[in-house]
Amino acid sequence: MDRHGVCAALMAGDNEAVAGAQRAHPGRIFGEYHASPTDIMRAVRELEHYVRDCGFVALRIEPFLWRKAPTDRAYYALYAKAAELDVAFQAQVGHTGPLFPSETGRPTYIDEVALDFPELRIVCGHIGWPWTEEMIAVAWKHKNVWIDTSAHVPRHYPPAFVHFLRTFGKDKVCFATDYPLLRWDRVLPEVDALELDPDVKRRFLHDNAARAFKLAS
């Protein structure tokens, strides 16, 4: 991180391993609670534990693993708890890399969740591709919705997304890599090649994520 000027990073995976990494690197690594679809009420209790006791900053759900769209009632207790705890909800949005049906990743489902939970900060991964313009519309509509760029290299961002990032969406896009899938030494030079205005670049690389996840770094 230091070598590439990265001041903070979000981490998800095995929850105990993430908690250990956050303890080892306070103020640099911020954990996300990765919810399992097998026991909802256990997940609700674990979310509270990892936020209150371990300092996690987000609930992370990958709907394709649950085989349920984000609007399914199975998630709503978790959304309510995340809103109560004032942590973000980070969702996999867009097609799935693994061989699962992609329908659960349609951005339009996030529209309904944002309406039902206006206090819940929602960060949508993978630029919503291939439904990126649909994702842009949802993020623009809702003040509590952001888009992140995980798993997408800047040179392949769709033109509509780059325009959104540069202009009316400059407060709505959070830089992400999906590390180690994409590494900073590959992606950050491509961010430089976008030649963003300094103010836009600062928001993209830092300010928007700091606001969406309420990071102190």
Ranges and model annotations:
Residues 57-58, 68-174:
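Catalytic pocket-lining loop regions of alpha/beta-barrel enzymes
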Residues 15-19, 40-43, 110, 131-135, ...:
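Short, well-ordered alpha-helical microsegments
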Residues 1, 22-26, 51, 114, ...:
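N-terminal cationic-hydrophobic initiation segments that often serve targeting/anchoring roles
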Residues 5-9, 30, 121-122, 173:
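Short active-site oxyanion
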Residues 1-12, 48:
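Alpha-helical scaffold segments that flank or form the walls of functional sites
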Residues 1-4, 162, 169-174, 181-217:
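Mid-to-C-terminal alpha-helical segments outside catalytic/metal-binding sites
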Residues 14-104, 155, 217:
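Active-site gating/metal-coordination segments in enzymes
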Residues 1, 18, 50, 82, ...:
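Conserved, mostly hydrophobic/aromatic
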